[in-house]
Curated annotation (Swiss-Prot):
InterPro entries: TMEM247. The lineage of its organism: Eukaryota, Metazoa, Chordata, Craniata, Vertebrata. Its main location: membrane. The keyword DNA repair does not apply. One of its GO terms (cellular component) is endoplasmic reticulum. This is Transmembrane protein 247. Keywords: Coiled coil, Membrane, Transmembrane, Transmembrane helix. It is a multi-pass membrane protein.
Length: 217
């Protein structure tokens, strides 16, 4: 039984050293079961990789400092290290391309904000001055037009004011004007007859003086 087990281990291990098993009697079932139970466990245990051994050695050297030249990395650990170095190189190459932005409370941002506020204030002042200038210009033009109209209307007021006043505006005004004119004529006639009847000598003397003055001139 031990011979068969040894041949199986030689076929599986491909040159690996097999543990020595004590000789047991074939009649003992318990002794035969123990090697069979322990054999699969030892056969299934994986052999540690050389890269794992190298990593342990590197950690030991970093902690305690081991003398001697560093060992060459194994082929299994090589691609991962190369990949990590390439990734670091890309990150370092990308860092300068990122634009530097100022912090929210930095003096650069405060100066930019002050410049923007000053620009807005100047634009507001320019618009306000422009509006005031336009308003003053419109007021000045309005005053000039009103002054011209007053100058044109003033001569007409004195020259044709009486004529416009005497012109009747409607039929009632015409009736009033006629009544006043007839009443004036009637009152004048009565006054003349009263003067001649009461002061005829005085009236004759006044008429003679007017005639002499007219003839003398």
């Amino acid at each position: 039984m031990a011979t068969e087990d040894r041949e199986m281990m030689e076929g599986r291990g491909a040159g690996e050293s097999c543990p020595t098993f004590p000789k047991m009697a074939p009649d003992d079932p318990m002794s035969e079961g123990k090697p069979r139970a322990s054999l699969p466990q030892e056969a299934d245990t994986p052999k540690p990789d050389s890269s794992y051994d190298y990593l342990e050695e590197m950690e030991t050297c970093e902690d305690g400092g081991c003398p001697g030249p560093p060992k060459v990395l194994s082929s299994k650990a090589g691609p991962a290290t190369t990949k990590g170095q390439a990734g670091d190189g890309l990150e370092l190459a990308e860092l300068p391309s990122v634009p530097a932005t100022a912090a929210p409370g930095s003096p650069v941002r405060e100066r930019d904000a002050e410049m923007e506020l000053e620009k807005v204030r100047m634009e507001f002042e320019l618009k306000r001055l422009k509006y005031l200038h336009e308003e003053n210009e419109r007021q000045r033009q309005h005053e000039e037009v009103m002054e011209q109209l007053q100058q044109q209307a003033t001569p007409r007021l004195f020259s044709g004011g009486l004529q416009d006043l005497l012109l009747p505006q409607n039929q009632f005004a015409m009736f009033l004007y006629c009544f006043i004119f007839i009443h004036i004529i009637y009152v004048t006639k009565e006054m003349i007859f009263f003067l001649f009847s009461k002061h005829y000598l005085f009236c004759i003397a006044a008429i003679l003086l007017c005639l002499i003055k007219t003839l003398w001139s």
